[in-house]
Design a protein with these regions (language model features):
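Short, solvent-exposed loop/turn and secondary-structure capping segments
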Residues: 89-90
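Anion-binding and metal-coordination hotspots
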Residues: 4, 48-51, 57, 62, ...
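Hydrophobic alpha-helical membrane-insertion signals
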Residues: 1-24
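Basic, short loop/linker segments at the boundary and entry of helix-turn-helix/winged-helix-like folds
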Residues: 17-63, 432
Length: 552
């Protein structure tokens, strides 16, 4: 009698079910290369309690989680509990809980930043980042907080003084004890009721919430006073401040809605759209951000000789004057050029916009300043119907600033006079700031090269945000505070760049690079990114994809 032997389980290599072309291997090899080149970042700690979950297993695991839209610590814990093969490989079959994952994110933000910088350096060495043209853009990201849980400056000071005044007297006859009893037991009191009503009218529900928290115990009182101090440190004018995330600023988004947001600035390389630099700011506009971005780019690209392209939102005269003296070239449209482009796009994508305008409004639209073409050679403005505005001899001075004025004497007899001029002047005039530096920047933008560079800005700079929101499924910030938000967005940028690398570089190329680094390490000891400069190599490229690394 033959007995068939049955086996209900078998031991196998956990990675045998993963496809060789999987995105997992891009993450795996990139991290291995990073670890081989930066061993000092993974040295074992010499003091304190030894960590069970070391950064060399946690960093690739967290990055791989972001690649799969698994971001929160709880979701990451539930992910490996489902016995995913990729998690077993990266974690070496260990089982970190959500508290361990959160501890890693808090303690190793510098390691995450170093990995982000390494990805950019790797792109430069392999040709995935050209470094010659950078596109900068910014967007508002909604803070992880409720717009209605907020306080104004006067409400905050009133609440702070109230707590300081009454929290010192905690006897049974004191107001602090009676208020605690009122909120805990909801007992009606003729003495407390009018005070609470007055507080509700003054500090609203948000202030009452903080007051309730401070009444619990000594620890809660200390935490509330610390929260009030943090809110006070982030006061900006008369704008409201969120009590949930005080570092998120009250800004108006592109839809015209007010809310608590962060301003996220990103620089994208022109070659394949990799993010070269990014940071979070609390400012409500982009006007002074170009100089800040230059500092990040200079450090990461290792040079200041490149071109940065931005939109008119970055037009800030003092910043442009400083930038003009630097080796970095800027391509930026002036207000007139930006308005003309916006009108052309509106006409192309929203033709119904002009359907509801009267005949007079349509005629006035034709004679707006941006419809007058500037002839640099003859230094004149040419109107829609051929009218020429010449430059006046005298400069006009307003608030200490000199302006060139262009006008014509033919306005009185012109049939378009009612639509082209204003009633006060009855004459068409165009004023231009008399500034040689600004004129040089404008002419650089109007040149054929400037137009070609700016033409690609939308697909690169704004396309990066579209990729983050659509292809990368980024739906908003899930952390609070500038530091934590910046760490979260660093992981998001790493995810974006690694997917770009996976798209434009074959797995076998990454594997070859890792093998050569290990080989050089055995022969020469410690190595760094300079090893790419010592190699005699070239990449075989086919259809914008690096398919092979050839070493001489």
């Amino acid at each position: 009698m033959n007995i068939e032997r049955q086996c209900y389980w078998k031991c196998s290599d956990p990675n045998q079910n993963i496809q060789e072309l999987s995105l997992f291997y891009t993450v795996y090899y990139l991290f291995r290369i990073f670890k081989e080149l930066n061993p000092r970042l993974f040295k074992r700690q010499l003091m304190g309690r030894p960590r069970i979950y070391t950064p060399d297993i946690m960093l690739p695991f967290v990055c791989w989680g972001h690649m799969n839209d698994i971001i929160s610590c709880r979701a990451l814990e539930e992910w490996w509990r489902r016995n995913d093969d990729t998690c077993n490989i990266l974690l070496n079959c260990r089982k970190p809980g959500k508290s361990s994952i959160n501890e890693f994110l808090n303690d190793y933000s510098e390691l995450i930043d170093a990995f982000d910088i390494f990805i950019v350096e790797f792109g430069l060495k392999t040709g995935l980042i050209s470094g010659d043209i950078q596109y900068e853009d910014g967007t508002f990201l909604k803070g992880y907080c409720n717009n209605f849980k907020r306080l104004y400056k006067n409400q905050l000071y009133y609440l702070k003084d109230f707590i300081i005044q009454h929290s010192n007297d905690r006897t049974c006859d004191g107001l602090w004890f009676k208020m605690k009893k009122y909120f805990e037991n909801e007992e009606y009191s003729d003495e407390i009721e009018p005070i609470i009503k007055d507080l509700k009218k003054t500090v609203y529900a948000s202030g009452i919430y903080l007051l309730k928290q401070s009444l619990k115990n000594e620890t809660s009182l200390s935490e509330v006073m610390g929260r009030i101090q943090l809110i006070e440190d982030n006061i900006k004018g008369n704008n409201p401040i969120s009590i949930v995330d005080p570092e998120a600023c009250n800004m108006k988004d592109k839809n015209g809605d007010w809310g608590f947001h962060y301003n996220y600035q990103v620089a994208v390389d022109r070659e394949f759209g990799l993010i070269t630099a990014h940071y979070i700011t609390q400012k409500s506009n982009d006007r002074q951000e170009v100089l800040v971005m230059l500092e990040y780019l200079n450090e990461r690209l290792g040079t200041d000789e490149y071109t940065i392209c931005v939109d008119n939102g970055y037009w800030h005269i003092e910043s442009l004057h400083k930038l003009h003296s630097l080796p970095t070239e800027i391509i930026i449209p002036d207000t007139a050029s930006a308005s003309k482009t916006k009108a052309e796009l509106r006409k192309e994508y929203n033709p119904n916009y002009y359907m509801y305008m009267t005949a007079e409004e349509l005629e006035r639209e034709k004679f707006k300043n941006y419809n007058f073409f500037y002839d640099e050679e003859n230094d004149v403005f040419i109107g829609p119907y051929g009218c020429i505005l010449t430059r006046n001899e005298n400069l006009r001075v307003r608030e200490g600033i000199k302006y060139r004025v262009y006008s014509t004497n033919e306005c009185k007899n012109c049939p378009h006079n009612p639509f082209c001029t204003t009633k006060s002047k009855n004459k068409k005039e165009i004023s231009v700031r008399d500034d040689g530096i600004l004129e040089d920047i404008k002419s650089r933008y109007r040149s054929s090269r400037g137009q070609q560079i700016y033409k690609n800005r939308g697909s690169h700079a704004e396309g990066a945000f579209a990729s983050l929101r659509e292809s990368r499924n980024f739906r908003g910030i899930k952390t609070r505070g500038v530091k934590r938000v910046n760490d979260e967005l660093t992981l998001t940028a790493i995810t974006h760049n690694m997917k770009k690398i996976h798209k434009h570089m074959k797995i076998n190329v990454l594997e070859t690079i890792l093998k050569e680094i290990k080989k050089a390490k055995k022969e020469h000891g410690l190595v760094d990114m300079k090893i790419f400069d010592n190699w005699k190599y070239k990449f075989m490229i086919r259809d914008d994809v690096i398919v092979e690394l050839v070493l001489d």
